[in-house]
Curated annotation (Swiss-Prot):
This is Elongation factor Tu. Residues 60-64 are annotated as: G2. It catalyses: GTP + H2O = GDP + phosphate + H(+). The lineage of its organism: Bacteria, Bacillati, Cyanobacteriota, Cyanophyceae, Oscillatoriophycideae. It comes from Picosynechococcus sp. (strain ATCC 27264 / PCC 7002 / PR-6) (Agmenellum quadruplicatum). GTP hydrolase that promotes the GTP-dependent binding of aminoacyl-tRNA to the A-site of ribosomes during protein biosynthesis. It is an enzyme of class 3 (hydrolase). InterPro entries: EF-Tu_GTP-bd, EF-Tu_GTPase, EFTu-like_2, EFTU_2, G_TR_CS, P-loop_NTPase, Small_GTP-bd, T_Tr_GTP-bd_dom. Monomer. It is found in: Cytoplasm.
Length: 409
């Protein structure tokens, strides 16, 4: 069977459901796909389809994620649902499925729970740009005032973690009631069922409130150097995959990381032995650099738009430590532990000086399976920025994965 072509006639965004374990994330995901399928936007998926999520490996960590897609009138969404709490945490930290926005699901019957707080905090730390809220299980609440109280609590919680709590759209409804209605009649149109309408209203709020991600090609140029060659009579070529932006022949770029930053001019861009006028995000290219010796540049450096990224050694990070079963350590580690940090294309040794738990208390040791905030100092400066993902390795095996939450130096 020929593969269907991906039609790019609508703006695309990645979205995920966030929330406490029994508040209805997966049921909501099913309700959204069914409600939009009834309007002609994609295929309906049942709870069972989504819950039996296949395992994925991201940076060596096994994560259960279900990928679902659906369309509103204006946009195409790829939706990630993680059945388990641990999967959710791992997914966010490793960026297995990068989210452009999230739907925070809170049970109107129970109000915010400890995990709700944890997810909002995590969304903030790993850089999920925007959230909208769905208060689920409205059918179980007969008191209007109780709904208002829960809404108020959720808004306060969002504001506490620097999300615009007062502005975030909150929709109430019942995912289960919507699913039941759509199972009985899979072609319910807008205005025919109050519970289905509430799901469509939620998606309207996502369409309106969630900004589209900036496309990778529009961001400032960055390419991690994977290999370096010298071509007699032409100069030095750095090869790698362009992470973002575009690079044209004749442009000035900077070589950043490990040694002092220096600038150079791009004298050629090649891909598959063909010359290009410009390379774009996603391309695997060779970039010819003027006046640079082969010894001046090495794997682990990056080529970047001048001034767009700087080298750093000290940062704070949000990290998930692999369990023994996932191939991680069998024993805990302590402050001053010195593993390798695998950033983009290279390992750099670093010292982990301190750990803190979510509540800000300092932890004495870190166990396999923990999620922790840590302070790191690398032995060499590397091009680092907030939100960047990395792996922690020891003797070539991955023992953790993290996201830079704050640059210190």
């Amino acid at each position: 069977m020929a593969r269907a072509k991906f039609e790019r006639n609508k703006d695309h965004a990645n979205i995920g459901t966030v929330g406490h374990v029994d508040h209805g994330k997966t049921t909501l995901t099913a309700a959204i796909t069914m409600a939009l399928a009834a309007q002609g936007g994609g295929k309906a998926k049942s709870y069972e389809d989504i819950d039996a999520a296949p395992e994925e490996k991201a940076r060596g960590i096994t994560i259960n994620t279900a990928h679902v897609e659906y369309e509103t009138e204006n946009r195409h969404y790829a939706h990630v649902d993680c059945p388990g709490h641990a999967d959710y945490v791992k997914n966010m930290i490793t960026g297995a499925a990068q989210m452009d926005g999230g739907i925070l699901v809170v049970s109107a019957a129970d109000g915010p729970m400890p995990q709700t707080r944890e997810h909002i905090l995590l969304a903030k730390q790993v850089g999920v740009p925007s959230l909208v809220v769905f208060l689920n299980k409205e059918d179980q609440v007969d008191d209007e005032e109780l709904l208002e109280l829960v809404e108020l609590e959720v808004r306060e919680l969002l504001s506490e973690y620097d999300f615009p709590g007062d502005d975030i759209p909150i929709t109430t409804g019942s995912a289960l009631k919507a699913v039941e209605a759509l199972v009985a009649n899979p072609n319910i149109k807008r205005g025919e069922d109050k519970w289905v309408d509430k799901i469509l209203a939620l998606m309207d709020s996502v369409d309106e409130y969630m900004p589209l991600p900036e496309r990778d090609v529009d961001k400032p140029f960055l390419m991690a150097v994977e290999d370096v060659f010298s071509i007699t009579g032409r100069g030095t070529v750095a090869t790698g995959r362009i992470e973002r932006g575009r690079v044209k022949v004749g442009e000035t770029i900077e070589i950043v990381g490990i040694r002092d930053t220096r600038s150079t001019t791009v004298t050629g861009v090649e891909m598959f032995q063909k010359t290009l006028d410009e390379g774009m995000a996603g391309d695997n290219v060779g970039v010819l650099l003027r006046g640079v010796q082969k010894d001046d540049i090495e794997r682990g450096m990056v080529l970047a738009k001048p001034g767009s990224i700087t080298p750093h050694t000290n940062f704070e990070a949000e990290v998930y430590v692999l369990t023994k079963e996932e191939g991680g350590r069998h024993t805990p580690f302590f402050p001053n532990y010195r593993p390798q940090f695998y950033v983009r294309t290279t390992d750099v040794t670093g010292t982990i000086s301190a750990f803190t738990a979510d509540d800000g208390s300092s932890a004495e040791m870190v166990m396999p399976g923990d999620r922790i905030k840590m302070t790191v100092e690398l032995i060499n400066p590397i091009a680092i920025e907030q939100g960047m993902r990395f792996a922690i390795r020891e003797g070539g095996r991955t023992i953790g994965a993290g996201t830079v939450s704050k640059i210190l130096k």
